[in-house]
Amino acid sequence: MPLNEMVSVVTNLVERGYIRKKSVVSALLSVPRHKFVPKYLESSAYQDNPLEIGYGQTISAIHMVGIMCEELDLDKGQNVLEIGTGSGYHAAVVLEIIGKSGKLTTIERVFELFNSAKENLLKFGYNNIEVIYGDGTKGHIENAPYDRIYLTAAGKKVPEILFEQLNDGGILLAPVGTYNQYLIKYMKINGQIYEEILLEVSFVPLIEE
């Protein structure tokens, strides 16, 4: 892995205040991003930009993955749901943070990406993950409730069923909107949902059935 390239990117993100937690820094440095992009884009893997992964989907920029991990306040042992596996890169970073005592359920709507991400994640030895092919907007009740839920694609609103699958005290993070999108942090406290608008973003649209 071109560690020096990622060190440079992560150092810059820390200096700019995007990343504060040591666990997020360590996770970003541990996951070889170039292994989660198409071969012809491997040389661009450590540029802090979104990259095409085919089928109209992208891998998020490094700073966005870092910001989302920070805002989710991830910790070891948590039960996490990811909507939109993509190439599996974001999932790998999350798995590094929640550790072997944690559990990640991730759902991908594009069959080809589901297949390649599952193969890739298992190849790197992650065995506390369940990769599911299907409509992520329905969540996955079988592994609920979740301590953390995050979406890697934007919809007009967050499906209510996802809030139902969120633990009390849990956090849900999602890009919301169509042309103008915002990353919104939802917190479930005593059964009530509170939201905080974090920043303007640009994500691919959420695919629904």
From Swiss-Prot:
It catalyses: [protein]-L-isoaspartate + S-adenosyl-L-methionine = [protein]-L-isoaspartate alpha-methyl ester + S-adenosyl-L-homocysteine. Keywords: Cytoplasm, Methyltransferase, S-adenosyl-L-methionine, Transferase. Catalyzes the methyl esterification of L-isoaspartyl residues in peptides and proteins that result from spontaneous decomposition of normal L-aspartyl and L-asparaginyl residues. It plays a role in the repair and/or degradation of damaged proteins. Pfam families: PCMT. GO terms for biological process: methylation; protein modification process; protein repair. Belongs to the methyltransferase superfamily. L-isoaspartyl/D-aspartyl protein methyltransferase family. It is found in: Cytoplasm. One of its GO terms (cellular component) is cytoplasm. The keyword S-adenosyl-L-methionine applies. Its EC number is 2.1.1.77. Its main location: cytoplasm. GO terms for molecular function: protein-L-isoaspartate (D-aspartate) O-methyltransferase activity. The active site is at S60. This is Protein-L-isoaspartate O-methyltransferase. InterPro entries: PCMT, SAM-dependent_MTases_sf. It is an enzyme of class 2 (transferase).
